[in-house]
Amino acid sequence: FFYKFIKLALPGAKFIHCYRDPWDNAISLFKQNYSISVFFASSFFGIALEYANYEHLMKFWKEQDGPDAFLDVKYEDLVQNDTNYINKLWEYCGLQGRYSEEKRQKHFGYTASFQQVTKEIYKSSVKKADFSKFHQIFMSDLENQREYWKKLQ
């Protein structure tokens, strides 16, 4: 959401847009119980609205600054072929040296779980069946919010 501010403050900044399947993303957000710090994540309805709003915002910035303003990385593709994507990310960012999986595993990061940063990239968060009884209503809410944005254009 702060893309333009960052771009103005750091004109040479590179922007990586990592996105994933909306339902998988919703499950992940909901399960983390971010209700105090990320209020919309306390319901699938709130997540659906926020996800559609985020999609609209990304569309806006890509129309404003062109398709090359961001390097788009689909999460599902990243976890299937992480080495290929890591090399693309390094090249896009103009980083010198080589990627080191060993260093990545030793890195400390602030995420929902320290174990998420230190363990190997895993594929178990793709196409989850958790909360399946809410899937259809989530997709309907997501589509309704997408339609809302289309009507405003």
Go through the PLM ranges and name each one.
Residues I6-K31, L89:
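Conserved phosphate-donor/acceptor-positioning beta-strand/loop module used by diverse small-molecule
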Residues Y19, K74-Y75:
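A secondary-structure boundary/capping signal
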